[in-house]
């Protein structure tokens, strides 16, 4: 039993050093809790930070954008605008479709938002057109969020109408029921229907009109209640053959009599089984397909949702015929899992590098084992807290743990180094542990709480960026806190049991060589420090120059928002002239698809043409390009995009816009490019005046590329100008005119066929094959007051005009969205400033407002708060250090080291060609916490030497620098090597991790060199300042 000296109190570590069994069991409990917690943690790409978003889609086939806006979108918007918690409301009204996207405040639960939306739809129902085929349908999904999974269903033996029917009833409904799925859309529009194509000449010859035919069909196909007979003993349900199920039955339907002879529908029309909408189509690798896109609910875990779908697929596909093939074209979780695996590997590599550094400095296996146990214990214990906080294993939390390897080992290194020093002086291990741990306890507490103080401002960041980094900050803070506990409990206890003077002095050739090298380095540092202390003003000039340089670099460095990730999926928009038809777009997409599929990096391609909830106009097509895995292709996604755009550029009449999908989706609408800027006015006329001017100005800016807008007002429209007096004289109303046109050209859904499994529509239209274009209007006939038929041309004049293809609103006012990318050599910050300058140059009137949207708006907000965030971190750290040291001066000395970290980080980012984005800023904030640790270790020992040994300030700080040089070098290298795997990351998701590593490695390299010399000089400067203040104000001395 070792005899303890009277002064060996051990501080807070004493109990744990003297009770090794209890300490071991306590640490085992932390380890076990962490292992169990890890098993329950979900896996995700990023923390769940989605805005509660709901999309409301209303389809009204045949309606123009004007009609959709006034009769459908506007009534809905008026009701939605009264909902509490609504952050933003945008809408898009195009031919036959109205899409309203509602984004709510982050604090509003999605289920509450859903209830409000349903109530608003109910309130608007009476204001909507009475002949809407279906009421508005809402989905808990962000339309800008790319599908988590895309499946293609093809068949070489069955028509697409049958394939869609089976997919809709047997597959899509089941997938929709999976927890986390927000919306399952079937692109391709091949819903089965009975199509009735009227022969205009035939019905005109018989004196009939399309309205006569429509009335006959709707009256012949009904499905309503008929009652029952209730007798004394038996009840009989009434039924009838009131339903027609097939095209053959409709063909035989009698619609009128001529001279006593029946006129059947087949006599005046082509009746066939077809698709409900013939202007919709989807292709998978150029083959006709039903493309199933699965989108998650905002906030749902993408990995868990995708796993549930994968488990269901084999069972669902078994119910389909053998000729129907289901192919998973894309699964976003594949890249997410790969990214998480790469980050986990980098975490393990960081731990290995840190342990290697410890061994290199200590050159003792028992001394290396101690921090080697402390590091994984601190990290694993963090998982237990993460479970209780509902966190996930994602790129940001794993990055926090990777960075934490350099942080958590610092405490253990400081404790071990201090205890080892006493053992080498001849102290018994137990006494050395008590003395060393007691002496260093306050330093550990100072380091821990000052470092956590740096993270506090991250917890109070607003909006989506704050939510995004909350898990990062809390995970890192928990790891640091557990590390402090381990370092004050387990580490000194293990030192007391595992270290001895003999083991520490046991050396081999490698140990002796390392020792000689360290001795020479420390001696050189001592000589250099002595010279620096003799020339303090030169050193202070260097420190001041560093501060100025950091400010200058901050102003000039390119700034961005969030790194552009290579997730292996590209979303695209194909744009054609505004007058393009469905047939021409289908032909164009075939040409484009052929070029894209020839690229060696492309694995699969899906394309979609037609108007629905996702695609606003006929002259645009949607594409999803799935790339081969990163290790199977030579180029990153940006190089592939450039190559594809070059390949398609030679196809006449098309413009291809591509952008890589991202894990972080802030936008609420699908855009052609990565960034958006809106121009809003009170009227469409005001927009039509300013949109071309602003677009031309933006297209001339070198800071922007691929500038486009969704303003399309050159679509061709046939204006039917009815002579109301003539129509009234003939007994023809405007409703008769609208009905006749709708019957002929609106793919009008006039009746419903009910079956046990699904409902199908009867579609009425004119067969325009022999009378294309405006000539088809000459075939329209209307019924006059006397029962005769009148050609439309007798009461109307047809004019061809230009009309908008879609009308967009933002918060109920007309808006145009400009989309743009940032070319190579420029940053998002450059682009934003160029747009703002252009806006000032144009001198827009007061009733025209502009605003950045999505990630560009978030960038503006983040950029505005970044400086305050760093200031808040410094202030928080000053307050904590001031409380711990009971001094106003010493915290300033410690914080004087911070500019060196900023200079190193910013220079490293510039050299690496990386932008100063949110990830890099987080790295700089963490550097503030790391770099000040060097100063804390120096100043703590200097103050102790002055207080306990009576040394002069100069001798005290000089000795403290030499004594603390080795642990400072160890902890800095440990932190640097913890960040090194992130900086050198090349796998999936490396774009997200690399800026953090670059900033930290650069900052640590520069600050390590400078702070070792500037800190002692600044310490002596403030010491003299403190003496001067006391001499001028003796009252301070008396109070002290």
Curated annotation (Swiss-Prot):
Gene Ontology MF, one: xenobiotic transmembrane transporter activity
Entry protein name: Multidrug resistance protein MdtB
Coiled-coil ranges per UniProt: none
UniProt family annotation: Belongs to the resistance-nodulation-cell division (RND) (TC 2.A.6) family. MdtB subfamily.
Location relative to the cell: Cell inner membrane
Assembly notes: Part of a tripartite efflux system composed of MdtA, MdtB and MdtC. MdtB forms a heteromultimer with MdtC.
Pfam families for this protein: ACR_tran
GO-annotated cellular components: plasma membrane
Native organism taxonomy: Bacteria, Pseudomonadati, Pseudomonadota, Gammaproteobacteria, Enterobacterales
The keyword Transmembrane helix belongs to this UniProt entry's keyword annotation: yes
InterPro entries: AcrB_DN_DC_subdom, Acrflvin-R, Multidrug-R_MdtB
Cell membrane in keyword set: yes
Membrane spanning stretches: 15-37, 345-362, 367-389, 396-418, 438-460, 472-494, 535-557, 867-889, 909-931, 968-990, 1000-1022
Membrane topology: Multi-pass membrane protein
Alphabetized SUPFAM superfamilies for the sequence: Multidrug efflux transporter AcrB pore domain, PN1, PN2, PC1 and PC2 subdomains, Multidrug efflux transporter AcrB TolC docking domain, DN and DC subdomains, Multidrug efflux transporter AcrB transmembrane domain
Domain of life: Bacteria
Keywords linked to the UniProt accession: Cell inner membrane, Cell membrane, Membrane, Transmembrane, Transmembrane helix, Transport
Gene3D superfamilies referenced in this protein's UniProt entry, alphabetically: Multidrug efflux transporter AcrB pore domain, Multidrug efflux transporter AcrB pore domain like, Multidrug efflux transporter AcrB TolC docking domain, DN and DC subdomains, Multidrug efflux transporter AcrB transmembrane domain
